[in-house]
Amino acid sequence: MGSIYRSEHMKLCQIFFQSESAYQCVAELGELGMAQFIDLNEEQNAYTRKFVNEVRRCDEMERKINFVEDEITKDLVPIPDYDEHIPAPQPKHMGEMEANLEKLEEELVQINKNCKVLKNNHVQLLEMKAVLEHVTSLLDPHSKREAAMSISEAARGEAGPISFGMKDEFDKPVKDEKELKFVTGVVKRSKAIAFERFLWRLSRAKVFAKFIQIQEQTELFSNEFEDKCVFILFFSGEQLRAKVKKICDGFQAKCYTVPENPAERTKLLLNIKVQTTDMKAVIEKTLDYRSKCIHAAATNLRKWGIMLLKLKSIFHTLNMFSVDVTQKCLIAECWVPEADIGQVKNSLHMGTIHSGSTVPAILNEMETDKYPPTYFKLNKFTQGFQNIVDAYGIANYREVNPAPWTIISFPFLFAVMFGDAGHGIIMLIAASAFVIFEKKLISMKIKDEIFNTFFGGRYVVLLMGMFAIYTGFIYNDFYSKSVNIFGSSWVNPYNQTLLANMDAQGADSNTDLSLTFPPEIAFNHDYGPYPFGVDPVWNLAINRLNFLNPMKMKTSILLGISQMAFGIMLSLMNHIGNRSVVDIVFVFIPQCLFLGCIFVYLCLQVLMKWIFFYVKPAYIFGRLYPGSNCAPSLLIGLINMFMVKSRDASFAHDVGTAAGKEWVIVNGQNVTYTINDQCYLQQWYPNQSLVELILLLIAVVSVPVMLLVKPFYIRWRHSRGLHIDLGHGPDEHGEFNFGDIMVHQAIHTIEFVLGCVSHTASYLRLWALSLAHAQLSDVLWTMVLRMSLTMGGWGGSAAITILFYFIFSILSVCILILMEGLSAFLHAIRLHWVEFQSKFYGGTGIQFEPFCFTKIIRVYEGLDQ
């Protein structure tokens, strides 16, 4: 039985279906979602498979549903979600579904066609009505006289300074207004000017045009409309009429024939108005009927879509099965979690019953050397953390899963970099809202990708907020300020008189005087360590970074090496699971020795320095420690360890003798000594040089052991004909090649050795990002909020304070929570993917992707990818 620590045991199963029960059995397996089918017809193309015709019919129905959905979307009709369970339709119902969808499609197509014709006719009637209403004013005697004069002037060459060159057949003056011909119509207002200019130039000013804008909208049943103009064009001669008509067609201007007799125009206008009213009523009834069809279709669209989705996915799955020679039996192969084989058998039994078949489906477990897929049973809490791991790579089959450890380590390392209790509270509140209202938010089926990213990781953000509050109190950082909960271990050794004198001196010299708190008199040594976190007095100190930076830097190293060491420990679980003794003895143990002899030793030095080396003189490990100036330098000490550099055996010599040049009080006694040169670089515990030499030799010897022993051991087993587990992944071949094995082992050895150094340095980002966040928070507080709080006067100060607080809040959320939070999030991901998981995690497995209706429907609804 598997767990979240290791993937589930998988079984390759072979299932024999009767042809009449195969569809229903696959439908039941789709509802269960615990079987990943293997395509047994990979060599066949999609057009030669057994159920290709059914798939094509499903594709055609899908096209019709998409067409209906497009029509619904055009009308801005909401499509309600269908939350009730919909069983997979029976194959015998496909004909009914096809008929219903075909009828609906034909009906909508015919309605759209009729609507288009009716709307065009209605537009033409409205345009004709507008022409008839305005043409009377355009055909008055004054307009005709003006047109005749303009055309005659153009014919005589008096139209203006432009020379048209040679004369043509149109260059005849108009002798009588009765010779004038005219064309009326409608053109878009945006084209009117170009239309008029083109007519003027092409006819050489022999066409006189007048325009009147239509005030009434001519496209009542369209969301898109343009302003239009009624035009009338005066000219003489039938040849020019043909040319004018072509120009009108080119500018998409519609021409309408208008009687010259006013009485006939009036009669025609009345007739047009009646037709317009009738046409409008017909269109409204047609659109009303279309709206009813659209609303009825919208109600059932999601239901039809889900039914078709299940139908099509079942036939796609059936196409993956092989057919026996009798054509009466289908054979399938699938991966099934071993713990769920009973449920799969029960689903097959239910499918057989529902299909009415008398022959049950038979499931056989197969022995195979195929690489199984990886499957973890997850819940809504663990899913987010597993997604972080899977984004790097899917775990190998039965490999140790990093996700359980990531649940704690990921938000904690994020919080070490984020480290602000105030911002952590905001993050916690936001994540809590997602968790509290998660059922309501899930039911809303929000498809926004950014929202779903945050909502899917709501429990990750929740723990990130909790740990940010915890580390914020450890750093005693609340919006860049400290909180005085337990008081302070430091006391002010200066009296009021001295402080007043120092203020006066500072004012006289126009300088800021700083006070120094000597630990001997200003620190309460009897108080002991601060109960929790950092003493709040450090927030007031000028040298607070000199104190906080080394603390955070060393803490980062401790956390980093601890996590890397834990990763190596997890690799032991993989070796035990693989029953690989050679990996345990000649890979795991040398890795532990290499990491321990150098980096764990460094961590022990950090802890010992914190515990033993204080500001007061003392005897430490039998050696006189004169004071903080002799506190050992760990970095240079580590370098000296690799260089095997000789060092003095203690911090001082001539201790307790008359030759001592200096003295200190240790345990109430005066002790004389002579301090050694660069005392902070000398040995600080007995036989330190010997111990470090031994550790260095062990670390150096571990490297060739990691590099050489395993490849030659595998070669020895191969030469003896013994079984060799090459540990190949799903995409690799199992042929023995000593050169490949040697190169592979060399890469892993070099990666581990160099990685121990580079990864340790990489963990310093925990300190760097914490410092950056603290400094940004301090700048924001100083430059925005404190500025408003220190403003004098009462007039408008409250409004200014509110304004600055609003700005402070917006910048805090946008910069310090979102931007800095995203930065810390990405760095935490890097530390887990590279520094932690590289010690034990392969990440080259195959994701278990069962045939599951729930997953398919979520992808169809746009909720999953």
Curated annotation (Swiss-Prot):
Decide whether keyword Zinc is in the record.
no
Name the UniProt key words of this record, in alphabetical order. Answer: Cell membrane, Coiled coil, Glycoprotein, Hydrogen ion transport, Ion transport, Membrane, Transmembrane, Transmembrane helix, Transport
Describe the outcome of a gene knockout.
RNAi-mediated knockdown causes larval lethality at the L1 stage. RNAi-mediated knockdown at the L1 larval stage causes reduced growth rate. The progeny of the few that reach adulthood is arrested at the L1 larval stage. Rhythmic defecation behavior is altered; the defecation cycle period is extended and animals have a slight arrhythmia. In the intestinal epithelium, pH oscillates once per cycle as in the wild-type, but the oscillations are diminished in amplitude and cells are relatively acidic. Also, luminal pH oscillations are reduced.
Q: Briefly, what is this protein's role?
A: Subunit of the V0 complex of vacuolar(H+)-ATPase (V-ATPase), a multisubunit enzyme composed of a peripheral complex (V1) that hydrolyzes ATP and a membrane integral complex (V0) that translocates protons. V-ATPase is responsible for acidifying and maintaining the pH of intracellular compartments and in some cell types, is targeted to the plasma membrane, where it is responsible for acidifying the extracellular environment. In the intestine, required for the rhythmic defecation behavior by promoting acidification in the gut lumen following defecation.
Carbohydrate-modified residues: 578, 670, 687
How is the subunit organization of this protein annotated in UniProt? V-ATPase is a heteromultimeric enzyme made up of two complexes: the ATP-hydrolytic V1 complex and the proton translocation V0 complex. The V1 complex consists of three catalytic AB heterodimers that form a heterohexamer, three peripheral stalks each consisting of EG heterodimers, one central rotor including subunits D and F, and the regulatory subunits C and H. The proton translocation complex V0 consists of the proton transport subunit a, a ring of proteolipid subunits c9c'', rotary subunit d, subunits e and f, and the accessory subunits vah-19/Ac45 and vah-20/PRR.
Family listed: Belongs to the V-ATPase 116 kDa subunit family.
Q: Name one GO biological process term.
A: nematode larval development
**Record organism:** Caenorhabditis elegans
Residue intervals on the Extracellular side: 431-453, 578-583, 645-688, 820-865
Q: Which residues lie on this side of the membrane: Cytoplasmic?
A: 1-409, 475-556, 605-623, 710-798
Identify the domain of life: Eukaryota
| Gene that encodes the chain | vha-6
Compartments in which it is found: Apical cell membrane
- Give the residue spans that cross the bilayer: 410-430, 454-474, 557-577, 584-604, 624-644, 689-709, 799-819
Q: Which residues form a coiled coil?
A: 51-121
This chain's protein is named: V-type proton ATPase 116 kDa subunit a 3
From the Swiss-Prot or TrEMBL record, what is one GO molecular function term? proton-transporting ATPase activity, rotational mechanism
Membrane topology summary: Multi-pass membrane protein
Which GO cellular component terms, listed alphabetically, does the Swiss-Prot or TrEMBL entry include?
A: apical part of cell; apical plasma membrane; plasma membrane; vacuolar proton-transporting V-type ATPase complex; vacuolar proton-transporting V-type ATPase, V0 domain
